[in-house]
Amino acid sequence: MGKITKEWVQAALKLADNGQSKLTERERELFGLSSERLRCLINNVCAVKDISYLEIGIYRGSTALAAAYGNDTTRVVGVDNFKYDEREPDKWAPEGFIHSNMKSQMEANLARYTTGDNGVTLDNIEIIESSFEDIDWDKQKKFDVVFFDVVPVNTSLYDDFFN
């Protein structure tokens, strides 16, 4: 696990405020719900060697790719059950189904990085297709950075996860 200090995060935020990170226009423009500033911040924070990044609610993968881009030793774990999409008319997928467009777009975004020296080490990215509540977190390695991007969420759900 990498060591992230308060000073590191402050410097990462200052860089992100100025639009500075390792991200290219490609990563900045991937469709997703995160802002360019947030992607830059996550990319900068995850630049510490051997960082472990968890994203709950990976959606289409743009923020997770920002964590991985240019950070060769960063381990990225993304969790999503692909059952809720606030951009769909029926936000919740019918029982027994997922929003397959979300999952296929996430897979397509990852597939863009399968060839050549492209800034992303796909072997360091793991996608868990599950509700985060169903994962036995005691069996997971610890994470240095957690991006909890789940909608809808309530305070007790958030508190239960982090306690």
Model-derived segments and spans:
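Rossmann-like AdoMet
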Residues: 1-33
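S-adenosylmethionine/decaboxylated-SAM
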Residues: 8, 26-28, 39, 43-163
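A conserved catalytic-core signature of glycosyltransferases
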Residues: 36
